[in-house]
């Protein structure tokens, strides 16, 4: 193999390791069995959430993970692997959530594992992460909780006002 090819591969691994280091959330899946249209739709959905998906040879994945300090992630790099990741701090659950949705829709998609903020996560932990709503969902839940006491107070005031109107008649 020529030195130029070896240098190009080493550069790719180094660049991918930097992407993995900066990633806030990483999910590794087995995607084999999806059609081209399904993979294209999957990538489009990931792009909308500021996430990326790369299909990389397992040897490169192991080397990049080692350089990124994710050595414990190496055991999941067996068989066909795609790495989904995001560096968006506001939406760290997106890769896990989208991968879990596709795993439910298509039996061929399998979540293998992942990492969150540099900590390796098991398949089960990634699935738990997928159950957490995104930032917008959490904010709407918080808003609902904050509005409840005010709304209940308004109902009580309205009921008191109505009862006084009825007693005045």
Curated annotation (Swiss-Prot):
On whether Metal-binding is a keyword of this UniProt record, the answer is: no
The UniProt GO MF terms for this protein read: large ribosomal subunit rRNA binding; structural constituent of ribosome
Q: Which Gene3D superfamilies match?
A: 3.30.70.1730, 6.10.250.290
CDD domains per the UniProt record, alphabetical:
Ribosomal_L10
Keyword match Repeat: no
Keyword annotations of the record: Ribonucleoprotein, Ribosomal protein, RNA-binding, rRNA-binding
Task: Name the GO cellular-component terms.
Answer: large ribosomal subunit
Q: Which GO terms describe its biological process?
A: translation
Q: Which residues form a coiled coil?
A: none
UniProt cross-references to InterPro entries, sorted A to Z: Ribosomal_uL10, Ribosomal_uL10-like_sf, Ribosomal_uL10_bac, Ribosomal_uL10_bac_type, Ribosomal_uL10_CS_bac
The record's PANTHER family line, in alphabetical order, gives: 39S RIBOSOMAL PROTEIN L10, MITOCHONDRIAL
Q: Which family does it belong to?
A: Belongs to the universal ribosomal protein uL10 family.
Q: State what this protein does.
A: Forms part of the ribosomal stalk, playing a central role in the interaction of the ribosome with GTP-bound translation factors.
- Summary of subunit composition and partner proteins: Part of the ribosomal stalk of the 50S ribosomal subunit. The N-terminus interacts with L11 and the large rRNA to form the base of the stalk. The C-terminus forms an elongated spine to which L12 dimers bind in a sequential fashion forming a multimeric L10(L12)X complex.
Recorded protein name is Large ribosomal subunit protein uL10
Q: Which organism is it from?
A: Lactobacillus delbrueckii subsp. bulgaricus (strain ATCC 11842 / DSM 20081 / BCRC 10696 / JCM 1002 / NBRC 13953 / NCIMB 11778 / NCTC 12712 / WDCM 00102 / Lb 14)
């Amino acid at each position: 193999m020529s030195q130029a090819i070896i240098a190009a591969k080493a550069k790719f691994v180094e660049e991918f390791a930097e992407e993995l280091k900066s990633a806030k959330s990483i999910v590794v899946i087995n995607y084999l069995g999806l059609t081209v249209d399904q993979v294209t739709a999957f990538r489009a959905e990931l792009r909308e959430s500021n996430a990326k998906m790369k299909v990389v040879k397992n040897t490169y994945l192991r080397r990049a993970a080692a350089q990124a300090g994710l050595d414990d992630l190496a055991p999941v790099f067996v068989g066909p692997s795609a790495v989904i990741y995001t560096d968006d701090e506001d939406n760290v659950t997106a890769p896990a959530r989208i991968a879990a949705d596709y795993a439910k829709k298509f039996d061929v998609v399998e979540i293998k594992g992942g990492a969150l903020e540099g900590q390796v996560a098991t398949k089960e932990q990634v699935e738990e992460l997928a159950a957490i709503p995104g930032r917008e969902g959490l904010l709407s839940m918080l808003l609902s909780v904050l509005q409840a006491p005010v709304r209940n107070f308004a109902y009580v005031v309205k009921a008191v006002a109505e009862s006084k109107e009825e007693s005045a008649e």
